[in-house]
Curated annotation (Swiss-Prot):
Protein name as catalogued: 2-oxoglutarate-Fe(II) type oxidoreductase ppzC
GO molecular function: dioxygenase activity; metal ion binding
Native organism taxonomy: Eukaryota, Fungi, Dikarya, Ascomycota, Pezizomycotina
Cofactor requirements of the protein: Fe(2+)
Region described as Disordered: spans on this chain: 111-131
InterPro entries noted in UniProt: DIOX_N, IPNS-like_FE2OG_OXY, IPNS-like_sf, Iron_ascorbate_oxido_reductase, Oxoglu/Fe-dep_dioxygenase_dom
GO biological process, any: small molecule biosynthetic process
Cofactor binding summary note: Binds 1 Fe(2+) ion per subunit.
Binding site for Fe cation: H254, D256, H311
Reactions listed under catalytic activity: peramine + 2-oxoglutarate + O2 = 8-hydroxyperamine + succinate + CO2
Keywords recorded for this protein, A-Z: Dioxygenase, Iron, Metal-binding, Oxidoreductase
Species the sequence originates in: Metarhizium majus (strain ARSEF 297)
Function, as annotated: 2-oxoglutarate-Fe(II) type oxidoreductase; part of the gene cluster that mediates the biosynthesis of pyrrolopyrazines, secondary metabolites showing insecticidal activity. Within the pathway, ppzC uses peramine as substrate for hydroxylation to yield the novel analog 8-hydroxyperamine. The single multifunctional NRPS ppzA is sufficient to produce peramine via condensation of 1-pyrroline-5-carboxylate and arginine, N-methylation of the alpha-amino group of arginine and reduction of the thioester and the cyclization to form an iminium ion resulting in release from the peptide synthetase.
Amino acid sequence: MATDTAVTGAPETMQLRLASGNGPVTRTVLRTPLRDALPSEVPLIDISPIFSTSVADRKAVACKIHDAATNIGFFYIQNHRVPSRDTDMAYSASLDFFRQDMEAKMKADAKKGPFDSGYRGPGTQRVNPDEGADLRETYSILYDPMLDPTVPDPARIPEPASRFLHLGRAPFESTDTLPHFKDAFVRYFQACLALARALTRTFALSLDLPESAFDSKVQYPDASLEINFYPPISTGHAVSAPADPDTRVSIGSHTDFLLFTILWQDSNGGLQVLNREGQWIRASPVEGTFVVNIGDYLQRITNDKYVSTVHRAQNWSGRQRVSMPFFWGFGMHESCQVLESCCGEDGKSKYDEVRCVDWVSRRLGNLFDLSDKG
């Protein structure tokens, strides 16, 4: 359980339990008022030069991303080439889906669908056992090569990659009450695919590697798109049993599993990041941007040089909130050891090589272990 500590002349603290790829860990959190992130804490990076023909321009952005990834693990990106029309359509379709009656939404129940993709209702998820149940509904799909414009013939994908892929299994047939939903979702998913691959090359540059270093590892990626629908938190909400405001969460405190996440959020806000001092800070919406955050696997292969930072969401806006995270990682059939460029002068790596499928299994297993101990 989370415990409080009072020190004379210093802010009160609490210990927050978290799941990780190495088992349960704790973070010391200051009980200080929530505040807005400073520009130096969650920087805004113009990534338009990553599309330039100039290597120097691309490296300049990579340097900025390197700084953000080592200091906080969160940053905004602008001029990302994802059309606003695509985000607007996906946002509108998401609202249309979640505002349906429960019977219509349950046609896409993730428990009935393939590979747990589809809809999850309110009160059915709890990311962190020291906090309340997540006050959200979600709809998600996994990477499907049939939705990937870079894959000319999904039926000819070789082993072992094909073993982990799910062709034509996105649960769109269960959303036929909204004919526009599939088109909006697919367009946005494809835009995120293109952006994620471009950012992967920039991350390679940021680590003093050739831009193409990770290209083959994301040819058939482990990727998913999730739409989160957050009702406003209220003290009388049926799911928010704990009395401590810190435990009432739209999504509980956690880190992400994979390489990085690309997050679109609406104007209502609610995303909070735990900074290095142990303070919760707001990563408020900035129009026309995405938030990018480092995941656990990227922290691992960089020997902890890049930081996978704890974050959560609390929707105190009084309005319905939507966020659309796109989770991005190497293909499940791939593996990666600590990068040589991250081992330092002594050449030591903190971690062994691990297959991505084993990493995800371990990460999920540790999450469930932590929940069971709550």
